[in-house]
Regions:
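A short acidic/small-residue loop/turn micro-motif
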Residues: 33-35, 91, 159-162
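Adenylate-forming
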Residues: 117-123, 144-146, 165-166
Length: 318
């Protein structure tokens, strides 16, 4: 009986493949550059080579691989393995799953990368042990994956869970999706970076200027570090940003009432400095609607391994 699966986290810069055992533990992994742009056929061959190489490097016979799972950006039909459109790669109507099955000679599952990462947290991370979970990643945008009754919520067009594009400010900041006021324009890590830069430009006396003299080096962590040193300007930026995070989390609770919400992305490394006020804000916003036990709000545990583990577990998500 096959003991291993391979999970692939396919990104625009790198692609990582991991050999995962029956306990959802990574026993070996390998990362290669994605090397875009290139034809889809070339990338498929590289993915097949990556799978065979990670198996060989870890002394696993490829015949012992039960299946391969892939998490990729884009609109993914999980049933067919068909990627309708991948904006990161510029591929339209990409027949990824069937093509890779032909190259590898085994079953291949393809899933949206946010869903795969969420499933990883559900299987082996911060959402383990819960039936209903939402995983939110605060990064360049806001990624989200929803697990209800132990199953990924995909929607009839396989596009469910785009929580980052829920509008929270009418006629607000323009979003790349075409709408205005989307949650990710206010609560993503890039939104925090944008507001930090604006605050620094408005206040030349903030200690953030002593921490970096170049606005191009400002990141989402800077305001947290400055606020911890007592900087009032940084504290105002953080408080405003956390309120926007809390608004979206309250919407998640009112919509899905999950048992647990896991927050990921680099800013989640702030731990309770981030989580405690988000928890308090969301609880206050939902207390007159949601009765009973408030959802657990915690940080993701698997970090960069969530996508690999989730992809490797896709066969159990059916």
């Amino acid at each position: 009986m096959s003991k291993y699966t391979i999970g692939i986290d396919l990104g625009g810069t790198t692609m990582t493949a991991g050999i995962v055992n029956e306990n959802y533990e990574i026993v070996g992994k390998l990362t290669w550059a994605t090397r875009l742009p290139r034809p889809a056929e070339d990338l498929e061959k590289a993915l097949a080579d990556l799978c065979r190489t990670v198996a060989r490097d870890n002394k696993v016979d490829f015949a012992d691989i039960k299946y391969v799972g892939i998490g990729t950006p884009g609109s993914v039909n999980f049933t067919t393995g068909f990627v309708g459109f991948n904006t990161n790669f510029g591929y339209y109507d990409w027949n990824l799953g069937p093509d890779l099955e032909d190259l590898l000679g085994c079953k291949v599952y393809v899933e949206n990368d946010a869903n795969a990462a969420a499933y990883g947290e559900y299987i082996a991370g911060g959402a383990k042990g819960y039936n209903d979970a939402v995983v939110i990643t605060l990064g360049t945008g806001i990624g989200s994956g929803i697990i209800l009754g132990g199953k990924i919520l995909r929607g009839f067009n396989f596009a469910a869970g785009e929580m980052g594009h829920n509008v929270i400010v009418k006629d607000g900041i323009q979003c790349t999706c075409g709408r205005r006021g989307c949650w990710e324009r206010y609560a993503s890590a890039s939104a925090l970076t944008r507001e930090t830069k604006a605050a620094m430009q408005a206040d030349k006396n903030t200690i953030m200027w002593k921490m970096t003299q170049d606005l191009d080096h400002v990141n989402a962590k800077l305001a947290f570090d400055a606020a911890a040193k007592g900087d009032e300007t940084a504290r105002k930026v953080i408080d405003s940003w956390i309120e926007y995070v809390g608004v979206g989390i309250a919407n998640v609770i009112n919509t899905f009432e999950p048992e647990v919400i896991c927050i990921g992305g680099g800013v989640s490394n702030q731990g309770e400095v981030l989580l405690a006020p988000v928890r308090a804000y969301a609880e206050n916003e939902t207390r007159n609607i949601t009765t009973g036990k408030f959802p657990v709000i915690c940080a993701c545990q698997l970090h960069n391994d969530a996508g690999v583990i989730g992809a490797a577990a896709l066969g159990s998500s059916i």
